[in-house]
């Protein structure tokens, strides 16, 4: 046997080490302070244990899935969380872009540079109205209109022509539409402002599936290109809008529209200045038209008479109309035979002759809706007895109508099945007569909330609360 006579180099146990004195600690501390920052960083890095690559670089099993399978998985995730998935990696970013179907452009450069099409190649709905407005970034004032929203700086919105002065030129909009149409052939809906006939033709040539079109700042000359859309079914024209821009859509434009869009199903006219001839032409040419909306009516007197030629019209909506017809034809003897629904929202109904002519034209309606209409008192509402086949009545925000005025009309509607009364403060629970109560009991649907007190009492039904102490002070 051989023995090693040298001392073993085994480490000394920590328990046997001598404790450092205070002076040694003080010297070591000042030695660290006198060292350079690079030396200190090197020392601390040497003390940090190395990170194992096996713990950080895990295999990405999603690489085994083809794009179609991964897209189906992403489609199961709610839309609110899909944007976070696009931040995972470049592949998921690309796949997320393929799933986006609707986009609202706020920066025109994003469209003109081609980034919109490369980022979202499968778009079906594109809104370009905000992008057509030259608006400097990082402005703190947001202007909201019922048609468009945009940002302005302090003191910049000083004239009524601000919006029109800051619109992109027609040429720029044309080039943008051409780029959009070239990359989004599956486009189904387009919203644009300040375009031209050529811009519409560029879109119609590439996007044969387009079904819905919304034209802001529209004019008669723009509508010359509307006939190129063979499958157009929904059209919204925004002409003259107070405070934003002035643009004229007259009978000429409505006639061009009628001749070019014979497959229209829904039509909305905002601030248009047509009249009887234009509405008549639409009724005769657009045989498939089922819904007509007139907003901010600026039409000529007598336009109501043109509705009689809309033989298949089922819904008529009047929204935000200060006037309906200045001089309706007294010989309105015909009506829209197929009309099923009349909806009046935020309209002035103070002219009795106009309301009488409107109700006569729509006497075949089965559903009547009044929302926040001014001037709808008992006298005006009594004209609604012209409707003989009403099944649904919806009243909201009609503060001048009373309980007796409501009762005098609906008791004559023997086919009434649905009644909804909301926020009509002069209709009182205490004024409901026995005959009106009997009518309520026979209805299929009753929504009765004429004021907050009525809403409270109906919500407390069956609880015993609000019954003059009956819940706590019962006789024994």
Curated annotation (Swiss-Prot):
Give every F-box domain span. Answer: 59-111
What's the domain of life for this entry? Eukaryota
Q: Which PROSITE patterns match?
A: FBOX
Which InterPro entries does the record associate with it?
A: F-box-like_dom_sf, F-box_dom, LRR_dom_sf
Which SUPFAM superfamilies does the record match to this protein? F-box domain, RNI-like
* Classification via Gene3D superfamilies: Ribonuclease Inhibitor
PANTHER family assigned: F-BOX DOMAIN-CONTAINING PROTEIN, PARTNER OF PAIRED, ISOFORM B-RELATED
Q: What is this protein called?
A: F-box protein At5g07670
């Amino acid at each position: 046997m051989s023995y090693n006579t040298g001392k073993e180099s085994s480490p000394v146990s920590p328990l046997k080490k001598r404790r450092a004195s205070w002076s040694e600690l003080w010297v070591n501390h000042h030695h660290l302070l006198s060292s350079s920052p690079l030396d200190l960083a090197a020392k601390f890095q040497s003390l940090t244990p190395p990170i194992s690559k096996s713990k950080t670089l895990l295999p990405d099993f999603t690489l085994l899935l083809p794009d179609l399978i991964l897209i189906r998985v992403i489609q199961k995730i709610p839309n609110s969380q899909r944007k976070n998935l696009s931040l995972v990696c470049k592949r998921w970013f690309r796949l997320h872009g393929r799933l986006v179907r609707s986009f609202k452009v706020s920066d025109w450069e994003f469209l003109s540079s081609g980034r919109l099409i490369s980022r979202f190649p499968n778009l079906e709905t594109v809104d370009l109205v905000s992008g057509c407005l030259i608006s400097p970034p990082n402005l703190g004032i947001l202007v909201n209109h019922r048609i468009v929203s945009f940002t302005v700086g302090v003191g910049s919105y000083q004239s009524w022509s601000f919006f029109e002065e800051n619109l992109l030129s027609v040429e720029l909009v044309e080039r943008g539409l051409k780029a959009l149409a070239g990359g989004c052939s599956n486009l189904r809906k387009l919203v644009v402002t300040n375009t031209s006939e050529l811009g519409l033709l560029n879109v119609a040539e590439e996007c044969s599936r387009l079904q819905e079109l919304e034209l802001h700042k529209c004019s008669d000359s723009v509508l010359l290109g509307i006939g190129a859309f063979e499958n157009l079914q929904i059209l919204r024209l925004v002409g003259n809008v107070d405070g934003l821009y002035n643009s004229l859509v007259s009978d000429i434009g409505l006639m061009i529209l009628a001749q070019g869009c014979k497959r229209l199903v829904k039509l909305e006219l905002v601030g248009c200045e047509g009249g009887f001839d234009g509405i008549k032409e639409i009724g005769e040419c657009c045989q498939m038209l089922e819904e007509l909306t007139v907003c901010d009516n600026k039409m000529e007197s007598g336009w109501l008479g043109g509705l009689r030629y809309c033989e298949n019209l089922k819904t008529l909506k009047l929204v935000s109309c200060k006037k309906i017809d200045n001089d309706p034809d007294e010989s309105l003897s015909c009506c829209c035979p197929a009309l099923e629904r009349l909806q009046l929202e935020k309209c002035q109904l103070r002219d009795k002759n106009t309301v009488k002519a409107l109700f006569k034209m729509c006497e075949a309606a089965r559903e009547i809706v009044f929302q926040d209409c001014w001037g709808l008192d008992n006298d005006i509402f009594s004209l609604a007895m012209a409707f003989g086949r009403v099944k649904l009545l919806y009243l909201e925000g009609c503060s001048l109508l009373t309980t007796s005025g409501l009762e005098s009309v609906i008791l004559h509607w023997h086919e009434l099945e649905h009644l909804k009364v909301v926020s009509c403060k002069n209709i009182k629970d205490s004024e409901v007569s026995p005959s009106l109560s009997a009518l309520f009991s026979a209805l299929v649907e009753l929504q009765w909330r004429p004021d907050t007190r009525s809403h409270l009492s109906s919500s407390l039904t069956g609880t015993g609360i609000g019954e003059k102490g009956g819940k706590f002070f019962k006789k024994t």
